[in-house]
Amino acid sequence: MEAVVIDAGSKLLKAGFAIPDQAPSMIIPTQMKIMNEDATLPDSPSQQANTVDPVVRGFIKDWDAMEDLLHHVLYDGLGWEISNEGQILFADPLLTPKAVKEQLVQLLFETFNVSGFYASEQAVLSLYAVGRISGCTVDIGHGKIDIAPVIEGAVQHVASKRIEIGGADLTKLFAQELAKSNPLIKLDISEVEKLKDQYACCAEDEIAYEKTLQSCNEEQHTLPDGQVISIKRERYTVGEALFQPSILGLEAHGLVEQLVRIISTVSSENHRQLLENTVLCGGTVSMTGFEERFQKEASLCSSSIRPSLVKAPEYMPENLSMYSAWVGGAILAKVVFPQNQHITKADYDESGPSVVHRKCF
């Protein structure tokens, strides 16, 4: 049986057997619904259920909910059988606390009785997915942006940075902007997210964005209840916030400048391999015009440091950026488990959860 690869994001959990040139067989909401104190499946139709988020801004926060979610994924979704569990490779977010790593390995060995475990950081795995071991990843997730330089398969943690904004924050911004221009229409956040996915885009540059504030074509969208909503400059504001964080009320540099500053803190002998191997990942990077805007901002850098993007190999699945860490995990699983580089049950029984820091790095 192939090892299972899991990448649990704040919005979506990606899981499947380690087949590198295929998309993960399960891509499901991480958020769960709770009814009568019992966790139901993520797609429960109940209208009265409360929701719980096992993962918040990349890190596991609700371990009971995570256990329920993993049980559904492994046994119901992927067909594991009790007492015949297999191996798991987990994609770790940047800067995962040691205590979280230990609790995860404890959960998997003691509750799920896995036969083997390995974890690697998402930044490293995303590079593996495009055939690189060195480079810099810009991962725009649902609840955070991680920028991480990686040299020879090792994340440079001192230089790495997490920015506490993500797709969810852009959705809230879009909701606020739509409410200003459509004050009589009430939208729930799930409707706003669908509208964002359909209409949000990036202007060509800051000058082009300023022009949209003065004049912008109007889109008319009919909602399921028959109401018609007007969408104009709001769709550009969402993308612009990544390059002008002041739109979100943040005193921070734009995405490309953040990347350049991070690379500049790494030894100059590594600048070139980091610059020439910049990888964009996360669902938000598929926003219309985002990649072009990123490249234009990079070309305008006054610094000698000018990032260039790595394209996904043609043989990789479409929309690779949405689950590149999972694909990289599938590639790595083909190495670590056959070569016995993983944590075995015997390793865990001998050393306990702390073995994860010695065997997975």
Predicted regions and their residues:
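Conserved phosphate-binding loops in N-terminal lobes of ATP-dependent enzymes
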Residues: E2-L107, G116, D146, H157-A159, ...
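Conserved phosphate-binding catalytic cores of ATP/NTP-utilizing and phosphoryl-transfer enzymes
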Residues: A3, V114-V138, K180, G328
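A short acidic Gly-Thr/Ser loop motif
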Residues: I6-L12, V130-R132, T137-I145, V150-A154, ...
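Phosphate/ATP-binding catalytic cores across multiple sugar-kinase/actin-like superfamilies
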Residues: L69-G77, T237, A241-L274, R293
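Glycine-rich phosphate-binding loops at beta-strand->alpha-helix junctions
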Residues: D92-V100, L108, A200, E204, ...
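Acidic, glycine/GT-rich loop-and beta-edge segments that sit at the periphery of enzyme/chaperone cores
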Residues: I185-D197, C201-E218, P307-F361
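Catalytic phosphate/nucleotide-handling subdomain of diverse soluble enzymes
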Residues: E269, V279, M287-K311, K334, ...
